[in-house]
Design a protein with these regions (language model features):
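Positively charged n-region of N-terminal signal peptides that target proteins for export
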Residues: 1-5
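C-terminal motif of bacterial Sec signal peptides marking the signal peptidase cleavage site
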Residues: 12-15
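Acidic surface patches and DE-rich sequence motifs
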Residues: 39, 100, 121
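Residues located in well-ordered beta-strands
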Residues: 31-33, 108, 128
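Edge beta-strand at a domain terminus
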Residues: 120-139
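Contiguous, well-ordered beta-strand patches that form the walls/edges
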Residues: 61-116, 124
Length: 139
């Protein structure tokens, strides 16, 4: 009886894990703003207002991230700069591999849904994003 109890507990723990799968990756497409950053020491920085946001576009296992500034009329100011990345899976975890002329870095996707996602950097910093909702004052 004790073994059955342990098996049920283990199944529950594994089932509750928020695992990202390949079908979730298109959720990355769109405009995102940082909600908060969690540092390795446990401290957090909350972001209530963002003057710049990220636009992410993914096709298959490649994509780019571009920083844009939203306007109050629903448009965005942007530049031609973009950070290209590839997505690869390693032991069931999806990773973003960025490479620019100046740098290269990796982030693990630890949670991904239609309206939120979390990545963790190589420095063990967690970035919590929420889907950006534009403010249009001209309506």
């Amino acid at each position: 009886m004790r073994n059955v109890f342990i098996i049920v507990i283990l199944i529950g723990l594994v089932g509750c894990r928020n695992k990202v799968n390949k079908l979730d990756l298109p959720h990355l497409n769109g405009y995102w703003e940082i909600e908060k950053v969690t540092f390795p020491d446990g401290s957090k920085k909350e972001y209530t207002v963002n003057t710049s946001i990220d636009y992410i576009e993914v096709k298959e296992h490649e994509g780019f991230r571009k920083t844009v500034q939203p306007n109050f009329n629903g448009t965005y100011v942007t530049s031609n700069d973009a950070e290209l990345f590839t997505i690869y899976e390693n032991e069931g975890v999806f990773n973003l591999n960025y490479k620019t002329d100046l740098s290269e870095w990796h982030e693990k996707i630890i949670s991904l849904s239609e309206n939120k996602f979390i990545v963790i950097s190589e420095e063990n910093i967690k970035y919590h994003y929420r889907r950006f909702e534009p403010i249009n004052l001209e309506q």
